[in-house]
Amino acid sequence: MGTAELSEIAAAKDLQVAVAESLTAGLLASAIGSGAGAREWFRGGVVAYQTGVKNEVLGVDEHLDPCSPEVARQLAVGVRGLLRADLAVATTGVGGPEGDDGHPPGEVYLGWATADAVGHRRLELEGEPHEILAATVDAAVELLTSLAADHE
């Protein structure tokens, strides 16, 4: 699955999509935004790399571990509301090369939010930092495509 399939489904269903990024620092929005027709359905994204931005802009609870399923979910809910999207996906985790606060490199969480549901996926990725980021973007696009396909 790639951005072309996501674009086709989102456009056909007249969906509006948004992303919140911590780990991927804009790579996901870039991948989506470079696709044909994205301006019709891609609302945009928020890069919330620092914890303060997560809290202040997207309403993430400041007491949570930034590398957690709950933060991933809150990021998705926050950006969906902020950008008035039908569905949203968020990325957070540790890209490496070193671990962070007890989390190993490659521990990644994708959060998602629609009008009716919120959830997350945990990924355990291996490789160099650029490989972990690329795999995270691919997984996020796949998740968005699946959410769009299932959207009623």
Regions found by a protein language model. Name each.
Residues 1-152:
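Short alpha-helical segments enriched in small residues
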